[in-house]
Amino acid sequence: MPTDNDLKTSIVELLRDLDALLVAHFYQKDEIVELAHYTGDSLELAKIASQSDKNLIVFCGVHFMGESVKALAFNKQVIMPKLSCCSMARMIDSHYYDRSVHLLKEYGVKEFYPITYINSNAEVKAKVAKDDGVVCTSRNASKIFNHALKQNKKIFFLPDKCLGENLALENGLKSAILGINSPEEIKNADVVCYNGFCSVHQLFKLEDIEFYRQKYPDILIAVHPECEPSVVSNADFSGSTSQIIEFVEKLSPHQKVAIGTESHLVNRLKAKRNHQNTFILSSTLAFCPTMNETTLKDLFEVLKAYKNHRAYNAIELKDEVARLAKLALTKMMELS
């Protein structure tokens, strides 16, 4: 059995031989992040990979991320060591999007402006594009939301109800959740949210904030906007993974901070600063199971197979789906 160091050496050699670009999301395992040419959040990696001069992109993340790169750069080869699917992205597909639109119309919502969080598959992004909507990420969500408000239509935000509710609260707007609230509440809401969520960020609770504030009165709380509204509204800072990193790295090493996002990222931040002053905002192990499926062995095997002309786990999209998804993604990039 090859050791981890053997695998790392082989992976570096294969990447060089294949002239490939390796990108990894912040939530990937440390040994994967260590080898990546670039690490980042969804928006950063989509831009970097699609604009790279490399023809072969190796994406360590979850499936919708690979799809986004393929849609933006259709002629590139995009492969993934694991075709892991984000649990939130699994909560909606094109069929459920159509059903949601049907419900909105049944409830008397004649016009709406759809925003899909990037955590959705390419077919959903294509549906949103056909309805003249746009994609957003947690980093640019406020800018995209402000653009949507100028359309003077009810906003349909999918699939993450928490991010949608948090954006509504940020703008003093009334929100309702499709499938939870009554037809009358849906009709009267400014923002209608699909009933999806992140299984990791649901672990962070208001009680966790209260615990840390009681124990350390001067502590700062930084969370991801996929957390529940009660958590976000009581935090000192809310932002994307990149924004959380930027926020924490600017703090004095003496400043205590509790962070509400995936544990691998928090542990890396702890290693960079005074670990005794850096905490994860949960007593539960908050790691993303699908983000952590990718191993060094998976990465080595997918590269070796590609070199031997036995490629697998290649991202494929229908031409029309890719074209429409690209429209929604490009619109997002132009607005942000």
Curated annotation (Swiss-Prot):
Entry binding sites for iminosuccinate: H25, S42, Y117, I118, N119, S138, H224, P225, E226, T241
EC number(s) stated in the UniProt entry for this protein: 2.5.1.72
Keyword field contains RNA-binding: no
Listed pathway(s): Cofactor biosynthesis; NAD(+) biosynthesis; quinolinate from iminoaspartate: step 1/1
Subcellular location: Cytoplasm
GO cellular component terms, A-Z: cytosol
Binding site for [4Fe-4S] cluster: C86, C198, C288
Location, primary (coarse class): cytoplasm
Annotated InterPro entries: NadA, NadA_sf, Quinolinate_synth_A_type3
Any single biological process term in GO: 'de novo' NAD biosynthetic process from L-aspartate
Highest taxon, organism lineage: Bacteria
Cofactor note: Binds 1 [4Fe-4S] cluster per subunit.
Signal peptide location: none
Cofactor: [4Fe-4S] cluster
Catalytic activity: iminosuccinate + dihydroxyacetone phosphate = quinolinate + phosphate + 2 H2O + H(+)
Keyword line: 4Fe-4S, Cytoplasm, Iron, Iron-sulfur, Metal-binding, Pyridine nucleotide biosynthesis, Transferase
Molecular functions per Gene Ontology: 4 iron, 4 sulfur cluster binding; metal ion binding; quinolinate synthetase A activity
Broad EC category: transferase
Known role: Catalyzes the condensation of iminoaspartate with dihydroxyacetone phosphate to form quinolinate.
Family note: Belongs to the quinolinate synthase family. Type 3 subfamily.
Protein's name according to its UniProt entry: Quinolinate synthase
Species name: Helicobacter pylori (strain J99 / ATCC 700824)
